[in-house]
């Protein structure tokens, strides 16, 4: 690993203190190749992609190449990729589209949907789970508050941290339009059974069609999984998949995969303007960031197994060192028996009345990390709702720290941060 890469992706050396970043589930730095792609596009492809002169054509070519790169990364078709500003927009676009689709179907069928009650039958029904990202949870809660939708939040299992397939199937109603379940949880790393959910929903749709009921579509937010494990839309069987660049060493834009966009799978724009992205997401394209996203996707396609193996080795070593240093005081919150999880994620608590996660991190001199999802950082003194949903006791969840390693994290980094945690605990317990 060359010096530039190690500086960007591993531990960070600065005077007078050395810092070790272990919050790669929150965001990642840009790979050097990504920075190069972005800067080259800024210099050479600054033209409007809708224009016919050289810099415009070059910009359009870069966008088309990036679209193909993203499609290759997820095993999809280039024409099914829509560029967006990021994961939040992609997730909102899916939810918005399903509300629109439901009402159009209602109009076409003369509101003949079989229903539990007149009020319920006029609203689309969504199914999700209790550990989703805020960009899924909050739009759905907003729809409920404004009486625009019905939502079932399926609890995850307290045994394995997963959304159970049978619970999701049991929640389906005649008015259900979408099941949205994340591919991997950002706090525990637990992989959700999305492939099985899609398979079962597809079988259910055949029965629904015979009864004149609309299809239930499946969406997964793959933000945390991309770049850490192979993601294939054919294996997953999903209709929508959210892509977030800054989680896999790309820029802070994103994309949405839509299977047979506008034909097999409905998509309705939230914005109206110049007609870019086939009118699904208008606005002059951000060519440099799209170039960087395409390069980040290329790197994942070429190196995913190598990245995954390295991160798993470092994460496993981290957990071994934590157990060796803290013994029975350590509780590994992200280890569930028989359940697959992300290779880079370690959520743990050090048990002790003074060892709340945010307090421990505040005493650390080397470690840069968080107690959980970065979007909840203003509530760091509260136990994580995700951990509580997974059956972690309140006193344990309150002490939680989430460490997520990256492509350049080393065993030496792990040794440093374990010693840092040791001194932080000693400080808090008055032993220093």
Curated annotation (Swiss-Prot):
Signal sequence, renumbered to the chain: none
Modified residues (Phosphoserine): 117
Residue positions where N6-(pyridoxal phosphate)lysine is found in the record: 247
Single Gene Ontology BP annotation: lipid metabolic process
Subcellular location(s) of the protein: Cytoplasm, Cytosol
Domain of life of the source: Eukaryota
Catalytic reaction annotation: L-selenocysteine + AH2 = hydrogenselenide + L-alanine + A + H(+)
GO molecular function: selenocysteine lyase activity; transferase activity
Alphabetized InterPro entries for the sequence: Aminotrans_V_dom, Cysteine_dSase, PyrdxlP-dep_Trfase, PyrdxlP-dep_Trfase_major, PyrdxlP-dep_Trfase_small
Active site: 375 (s-selanylcysteine intermediate)
Phosphoprotein is among the record's keywords: yes
EC number: 4.4.1.16
Keywords, sorted A to Z: Acetylation, Cytoplasm, Lyase, Phosphoprotein, Pyridoxal phosphate, Transferase
Function: Catalyzes the decomposition of L-selenocysteine to L-alanine and elemental selenium.
Name used for this protein in its record: Selenocysteine lyase
């Amino acid at each position: 690993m060359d010096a530039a890469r190690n500086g960007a992706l591993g531990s960070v050396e600065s005077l007078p203190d050395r810092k070790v970043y272990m919050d790669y589930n929150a965001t990642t730095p840009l790979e050097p190749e990504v920075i190069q792609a972005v800067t080259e596009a800024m210099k050479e492809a600054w033209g409007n992609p809708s224009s016919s002169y050289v810099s415009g054509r070059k910009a359009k070519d870069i966008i088309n190449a990036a679209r193909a790169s993203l499609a290759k990364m997820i095993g999809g078709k280039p024409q099914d990729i829509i560029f967006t500003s990021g994961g939040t927009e992609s997730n909102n676009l899916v939810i918005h589209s399903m509300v629109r689709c439901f009402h159009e179907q209602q109009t076409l069928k003369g509101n003949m949907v079989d229903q539990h009650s007149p009020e319920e039958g006029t609203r689309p029904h969504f199914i999700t789970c209790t550990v989703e990202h805020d960009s899924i949870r909050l739009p759905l809660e907003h729809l409920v508050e404004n009486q625009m939708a019905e939502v079932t939040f399926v609890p995850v299992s307290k045994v394995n941290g997963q959304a159970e397939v049978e619970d999701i199937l049991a929640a389906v109603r005649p008015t259900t339009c979408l099941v949205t379940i994340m591919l991997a949880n950002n706090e525990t790393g637990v992989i959700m059974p999305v492939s099985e959910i899609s398979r079962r929903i597809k079988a259910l749709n055949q029965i629904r069609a015979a009864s004149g009921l609309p299809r239930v579509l499946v969406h997964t937010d793959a933000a945390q999984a991309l770049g850490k494990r192979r993601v294939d839309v054919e294996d997953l069987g999903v209709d929508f998949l959210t892509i977030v660049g800054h989680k896999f060493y790309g820029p802070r834009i994103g994309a949405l995969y839509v299977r047979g966009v506008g034909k097999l799978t409905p998509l309705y724009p939230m914005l109206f303007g110049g007609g870019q992205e086939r009118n699904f997401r208008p606005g002059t394209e951000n060519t440099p960031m799209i170039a960087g996203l395409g390069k980040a996707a290329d790197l994942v396609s070429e190196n995913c197994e190598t990245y995954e193996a390295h991160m798993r080795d470092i994460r496993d070593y981290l957990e071994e060192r934590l157990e060796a240093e803290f013994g029975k005081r350590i509780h590994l919150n992200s280890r569930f028996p028989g359940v697959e999880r992300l290779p880079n994620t370690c959520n743990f608590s050090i048990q002790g009345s003074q060892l709340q996660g945010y307090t421990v991190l505040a005493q650390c001199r080397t470690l840069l990390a968080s107690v959980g999802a970065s979007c909840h950082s203003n509530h760091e003194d509260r136990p994580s709702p995700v951990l509580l949903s997974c059956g972690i006791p309140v006193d344990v969840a309150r002490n939680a720290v989430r460490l997520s390693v990256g492509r350049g994290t080393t065993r030496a980094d792990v040794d440093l941060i374990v010693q840092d945690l040791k001194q932080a605990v000693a400080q808090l317990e008055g032993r220093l």
